[in-house]
Amino acid sequence: MATLQGTPVLILKEGTQRTVGRDAQRMNIMAARVIAEAVKSTLGPKGMDKMLVDSLGDVVITNDGVTILKEMDVEHPAAKMIIEVAKTQDNEVGDGTTTAVVLAGELLKKAEELLDQDIHPTVIARGYRMAANKAVEILESIAMDIDVEDEETLKKIAATAITGKHSEYALDHLSSLVVEAVKRVAEKVDDRYKVDEDNIKLEKRQGGSVADTKLVNGIVIDKEVVHPGMPKRVKNAKIAVLKAALEVKETETDAEIRITDPDQLMKFIEQEEKMLKEMVDRLAEAGANVVFCQKGIDDLAQYYLAKAGILAVRRVKQSDIEKIAKACGAKIITDLREITSADLGEAELVEERKVGDEKMVFIEGCKNPKAVTILIRGGSEHVVDEVERSLQDAIKVVKTALESGKVVAGGGAPEIEVALKIRDWAPTLGGREQLAAEAFASALEVIPRALAENSGLDPIDILVELRKAHEEGKTTYGVDVFSGEVACMKERGVLEPLKVKTQAITSATEVAIMILRIDDVIAAKGLEKEKGPEGESGGEEDSEE
């Protein structure tokens, strides 16, 4: 509402809420901090889990930051911005989602203290941006080069990502599987590795224990052989991968066939049978003894395939069809008339097996597979789901380390080192940006503090010890949450890719600056509020005011 020469002018729609100035900033900062506090207790190997129950009663138990935030039904726009940070971190590097969110929350908390001292948000934003650039510079200077051929180092990186997610008793086994899987699908381009993590399929099946999880040098698909008369096990498989259906095509035009005597009907049926038999004969002539089809397989075609001793699977997902082709070296066939033996892929064994209560088809022993499968096992559905999430993180982290070749120590060591260096550098800025840079340094210390708190250690004692160690030049010293002491994280094998840290700091800083610069929130009246519980208009409520 505004007034012009005493006349009230209605600018915004009735029911629109507007929050201006310091109130808007405080409200946004509070919303972001609430989200950060929600996941703070999950940080690190000793972090707690969250149980999330959705509106349908489905339960998710996890301490994976991005999963928690995705499952939360958040309404506040500033809180949604913080959740976007976690999603970006997850998509880019796979790990460090909780770190990014907690850091964003702490940066906003420190910014609020500066706002109380009448420091302008633009000055704080400028100081934060300069400090973030300096932080990335410092991280790059303390990063360690790794030999990408050194599997032990890669296993340590994978183990750091997996630790704390229901997988500790099979940690060595799982980290070995991850490294082997990533190296199988990695391609060398000009002395650098390129990894497409989509070529690593994670197939989960409840039953057994986490230690029963295994890597298959090929593909496992959640399907069964289509006909009981077909072989269930084929050695030295020649695999045809089809996008076309093994069915008689229906014409696109509406045609009507008038049949006047039984012979014509028999000819019609015989022609259909002949067409299906020709399709199967073409596959057999090309030398195929295994067929994976993206579309349907006619019942009669199934019979002919079984008669020819060919194992067939139908209605395979397109993503699986592509992975099968990559794993066994087959060409995807769209027209059966052009199939040749050169189009077929090869595998040592294709077999239908019962895993748990259901049947699955295994394609194993591919010579040079460019797609592999990790079959995840576990005692309960929640354990299997959490192991799947931890393996997804580990795969992305190992991929990032392979591609960049640089790592930093874990356990809060890089954050303490960066905080120390930024405090030394801040006085060179002059002006009020110096205060923002110092606040940035203090905010970084929330990571080692949270690691200590979540492990039941005294955060003040740990921080004092860490600062002392880093003052003495011990740049890799961090919190060992298992022994409860400050130690060299490099020696303890706690390593993370450099990109995980740089991405977390830049993402957290960007979102903190964006939220800080908002001084006016104009919220339109939501549809839910306009309608009553029966879908009636909320007019009565408006008239009462």
UniProtKB/Swiss-Prot annotation:
SUPFAM superfamilies: GroEL apical domain-like, GroEL equatorial domain-like, GroEL-intermediate domain like
Keyword Oxidoreductase on entry: no
Keywords: ATP-binding, Chaperone, Nucleotide-binding
GO MF term (any one): ATP binding
Name of the molecule in the record: Thermosome subunit alpha
Function description: Molecular chaperone; binds unfolded polypeptides in vitro, and has a weak ATPase activity.
Tagged with keyword Chaperone: yes
Disulfide bonds: none
Entry-linked CDD domains: cpn60
Quaternary structure and partners: Forms a Heterooligomeric complex of two stacked eight-membered rings.
Gene3D superfamilies: GroEL, GroEL-like equatorial domain, TCP-1-like chaperonin intermediate domain
InterPro entries attached to this UniProt entry: Chaperone_TCP-1, Chaperonin_TCP-1_CS, Cpn60/GroEL/TCP-1, GroEL-like_apical_dom_sf, GROEL-like_equatorial_sf, TCP-1-like_intermed_sf, TCP-1_chaperonin, thermosome_alpha
PANTHER family: CHAPERONIN
UniProt similarity note: Belongs to the TCP-1 chaperonin family.
TM region(s), chain numbering: none
